[in-house]
Amino acid sequence: MCGILAVHHVAEDIEAFKPKALHLSKQLRHRGPDWSGKAIRNQTILCHERLAIVGVESGAQPLVSDDGKLVLTVNGEIYNHLKLRENLKGNYKFKTYSDCEVILYLYREHGPACANMLDGMFSWVLYDQDKDKVVAARDPIGITTLYQGFSSDSPDTAYFASELKALHPVCDKIIAFPPGHYYDSETKQTVRYFKPSWWDENKIPSNPVDYKLLRETLEASVRKRLMAEVPYGVLLSGGLDSSLIASIAARETEKLANSTSQSEEARTITAWPKLHSFAIGLPGSPDLLAARKVADFLHTFHHEHTFTIDEGLDALRDVIYHLETYDVTTIRASTPMYLLSRKIKAQGVKMVLSGEGSDEIFGGYLYFGNAPSREAFHSECVRRVKNLHLSDCLRANKSTMAWGLEARVPFLDKDFLEVALNIDPEEKMYINGRKEKYILRKAFDTTHDSSLQPYLPQDILWRQKEQFSDGVGYSWIDALKDTAELCISDDEFALPRREWGDDIPTTKEAFWYRKLFDEIFPRQCADTVMRWVPKAEWGCPEDPSGRYQAGHVAALK
């Protein structure tokens, strides 16, 4: 991934605005430390801060079409780029080996709707010189971050950037650009291009679970995400989701390393034929112990890192600066991920696989055990998936990209979502003694199939859900709460700020994070934040920690 900035129809002289644009783009350089680029056409400027993963030597951006009339700045990876190149009708002269260059010619042949043809994670802005317009698009789920800004001083100017910090100095209104949409400045319309069969949360599927299909679709998703020309690894917490991704990745890495094929998959081999795994936690935390066991089982080159509570607290302001949120759940989980990402990047790794999305797809958060019906269970799953760009995707993207590390999330593959969200929700529910994410566990349980090698140790495969902020060590959350008590007095807590409106923090911890956020960001940035809380209507505690949910408490008795 990278950092992008685009400003269309600049109100002032473009050359006079250029230094300001470059300064704004510089705020994103942590996302792309490898190179900086810009392109100016008429009154439009596109900037790019590059993290080179594919097309390392030739893929500098912005990308320009063979006739010079289309200019593109992209943050993301297009996994089907080779097939898309082959299917182009025209005979185009590609200038790079970048996976993103194909977007230029897809747009030429199909217009803005070409976004629906892309299999990957992406945010991009394209300038069409003939029509003097821009088109912006974001991937279906919002794995990559993208914001759109507006200025009352120049209402005809369109602003786009990967992060808020590149927009708030010049925009007085900012929105999170909706996933699965494209924007066309010619019509000034934002159009939803992503229309999967599962989108209507009131349409309840009735398909029985096909365990083989579920397993093979996830394996295919991991395989395509190994596309890289740089060393990669996996984030391994020792929980079900990250452990499954690590297991599949280890198999695929070994398979590719031993292959003599020149297929698309074979070209993803890096300098490391053995998979590297990375874990973090407080000393002695549940995640570290479980991750170590998984790494031993998979024979990965395992890197275990610890942090102290003081180190986590010291990083908190930086975490809020990079995450651009005050949501309690996101900040709790992002802090160890942020610290781990720094360690990983220092070890020469640029890309990791991560396990985000599984809990939303399969109802893995323990509060789902309170779902009153299959209909309610499914609707909540779909709602959570639709809002991932405001929570876990935001965390996975910004925690890692703070250090120029790219995170890829196989569970959010379009094909996998199509399979998993069309399963009868009753198959996912916590009934008849079933654990959370039962069908996912069952799909990778080889106990009764001697033709398959085990994916994971049984006690890991059937380990109860621990949210990342819990698994790194329960004392981490306790320390955050205790520190908030010291930082926020009872008198201050009783007088929330008027500008917060109805978004009033209900705990001192939430109040503290909002206060820190306001010290860093101007008021308009708060409109992009959504707080993650369990389903109150289901009788769930408001604290998002999994250990406060009934299922976790019952399991400990």
Curated annotation (Swiss-Prot):
One of its GO terms (biological process) is L-asparagine biosynthetic process. GO terms for molecular function: asparagine synthase (glutamine-hydrolyzing) activity; ATP binding. The modification Phosphoserine is found at residues 391, 489. ATP binds at residues 235, 280, 354-355. It catalyses: L-aspartate + L-glutamine + ATP + H2O = L-asparagine + L-glutamate + AMP + diphosphate + H(+). InterPro entries: Asn_synth_AEB (IPR006426), Asn_synthase (IPR001962), Asn_Synthetase (IPR050795), AsnB_N (IPR033738), GATase_2_dom (IPR017932), Ntn_hydrolases_N (IPR029055), Rossmann-like_a/b/a_fold (IPR014729). Signal peptide: none annotated. The active site is at residue 2. It comes from the Eukaryota. This is Probable asparagine synthetase [glutamine-hydrolyzing]. It comes from Schizosaccharomyces pombe (strain 972 / ATCC 24843) (Fission yeast).
